[in-house]
């Protein structure tokens, strides 16, 4: 049971529900206090970064821990996504090369990750991201222990009809195969939207019953809009 988390509040929430789950703190910009609490209070060992300052912060906040899983997030094109995250998060390949080498020195397990952007409508974006990881592997001669292909898997909306999720997984498998590695790293992903976007829950109060009609304190212009 693994969960991607982006804040200390998410960590606390999940740990209250199940204290045994494995958490990955994959936000690349974290406060030193949240890193320290995640590590010492909640047993988090996986942290994401996209710059040297964040790496330094992680090491300081964990007292130079020797059991860290450090994920270097690289920036890739988000051209096929509804929400572009590439300008905000991720290291350019030119910067990632040195960052991968540096993170390797301080991690028990090294990961490389990317994110194709939210609600990605073209599965080829994932193989492009894997191709960029392949370029980094060739230039650094470092094979990561873990590759995280991130999230961005699309859900169905009234004006957006993506291909089935299995097609995205097939594209990822193809991209991994094209890396041509003798030993494959562990492959993980963050499929949150694709799993839960079409579900939801609401708590409402019945104000009036008129024969077979119930009138509640919510409606089309509230949480029932979708």
What do these predicted ranges mean?
Residues 122-226:
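C-terminal active-site-proximal or functional interface alpha/beta core segments in diverse enzymes
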Residues 1-146:
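Active-site-proximal beta-alpha core segment in soluble small-molecule metabolic enzymes
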């Amino acid at each position: 049971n693994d969960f991607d988390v982006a804040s200390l509040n998410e960590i606390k929430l999940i740990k209250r529900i199940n204290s045994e789950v494995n958490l990955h703190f994959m936000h690349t910009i974290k406060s030193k206090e949240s890193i320290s609490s995640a590590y010492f209070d909640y047993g988090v060992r996986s942290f994401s970064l996209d710059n040297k300052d964040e790496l330094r912060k992680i090491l300081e906040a964990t007292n130079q821990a020797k059991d860290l899983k450090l994920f270097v997030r690289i920036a890739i094109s988000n051209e096929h996504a509804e929400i572009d995250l590439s300008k905000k998060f991720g290291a350019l390949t030119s910067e990632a090369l040195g960052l991968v080498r540096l993170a390797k020195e301080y991690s028990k397990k090294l990961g490389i990750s990317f994110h194709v952007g939210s609600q990605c409508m073209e599965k080829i974006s994932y193989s492009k991201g894997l191709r960029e990881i392949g370029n980094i592997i060739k230039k650094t001669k470092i094979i990561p222990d873990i590759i995280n292909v991130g999230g961005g898997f699309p859900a169905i909306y009234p004006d957006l009809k993506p291909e089935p999720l299995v097609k995205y997984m097939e594209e990822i498998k193809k991209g991994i195969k094209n890396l041509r590695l003798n030993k494959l790293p562990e492959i993980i992903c963050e499929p949150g939207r694709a799993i839960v976007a079409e579900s939801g829950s609401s708590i409402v109060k019945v104000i009036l019953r008129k024969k077979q009609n119930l009138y509640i304190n919510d409606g089309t212009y509230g949480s029932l809009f979708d």
